[in-house]
Structures are given as structure tokens and as C-alpha cells.
Amino acid sequence: MSIGRLTKQKNFSYLINEFSTFSKNNEDFLLYILGDGEEKNKLIKLIKEKDMEKKVFLIGRVNNVFNYIKNSEIFILSSLWEDPGFVLAEAGLGNLFVISSDCPNGPKEILDYGKNGLLFKNNQKNDLANSINKYISLTENEKFSMKSKLKKNISKYSIFKHNQIFKRIFS
């Protein structure tokens, strides 16, 4: 899954192209993209061109993303740049495995490649698809360990501590 405004910054066209490549050998995965924006029609067209209408779903704007997070396995951030990457923290706190572009501001501060998530080179052909395949090759213990380390790293940031407290109160 991925979350964000459907804008050039979020680079969802790259995500859809890479997911299409990945899906050729992995038919059981689906991609849900939450958000709305000016690139919606362009992305719908790309999904049709790639014949991915049954695998990639543009959900639109959602008030409670945690309902989607709790039913997902992986969070992918494909942004060209990010300020400051709160969505990565939300995904990590939601117990998702995080795969992110190595874009400026956010991901590299939160993720340590291979220790608490995976980073890929943005717009590099097959790099995201290879990262998803890397995730699949991990054992359940490795996935659990990496997600736990990500939560621990996120907890260092005070704003995320407050987010956890609010989440407990309102859950």
C-alpha cells in the first residue's frame, strides 16, 4: 500500500510501473494507493495501459488510514522528496514493513537499509521491484525483527511518541 497526494512529488507512476514488473512473477499481491490529486486521471490511464485494473486500486482520500494499514503488509513510499516523512512513521507504528525511495528529507533519517526497512534508488528501473522481492525472501523472524527495530527508531522522535499516545487513547 501507499498513501499520498496524487502528485508528481509522490511519483506514483514509478510505483505502478515497478509494481507491474514485480507482479509478472508475483500474482498474489495487490497495490492500494490512498489519496487524491491532479495526477489521478494519468494514473488511471497508466493502470489500464499496464493491464493492472485487478491489481492496482486508487482508493481516493480516506479519513482513517489506519483501517487500511492494519489490513496491509507492506508500505511503499515512492516520493521524489518528502517533508519530513510522517507517513513512514505512521506506517511503521501501524506494524507495516516499510520500503522507501532514498529521497531527501525523511526516509534516510528513519530507515537503515536492511536493519529496519528497505530503501531503493528512485526512478531506477527494477530497483523497487527488486526491493519487494527482497522483502519476500526474508523469513518471518527477519520481517518481525526489522519492523520492531523501525518502531524503536521512530519512538526516538518526540512527535511520534505523541502520535503513539493518541493512537492508544483513541483505539
For the regions a language model picked out, list residue spans one by one.
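Short acidic/histidine- and often glycine-rich active-site loop of Leloir-type glycosyltransferases
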Residues: 90, 103-114, 118-119
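Conserved acidic donor-binding segment of nucleotide-sugar-dependent glycosyltransferases
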Residues: 112-114, 118-125, 134-140
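Short hydrophobic beta-strand element within catalytic cores of glycosyltransferases
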Residues: 97-101
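A short alpha->beta transition loop at the rim of the catalytic pocket in nucleotide-sugar-dependent
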Residues: 66, 73, 93-95
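A charged, aromatic-enriched C-terminal amphipathic alpha-helix characteristic of glycosyltransferases
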Residues: 119, 143-171
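Aromatic "clamp/platform" in nucleotide-sugar-dependent glycosyltransferases that forms part
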Residues: 61, 80
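A conserved mid-protein helix/loop that constitutes part of the nucleotide-sugar donor-binding site
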Residues: 1-21, 31, 38-44, 86
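Short glycine/proline-enriched, acidic/aromatic patches that form the donor-sugar handling elements
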Residues: 65-66, 84-85, 104-110
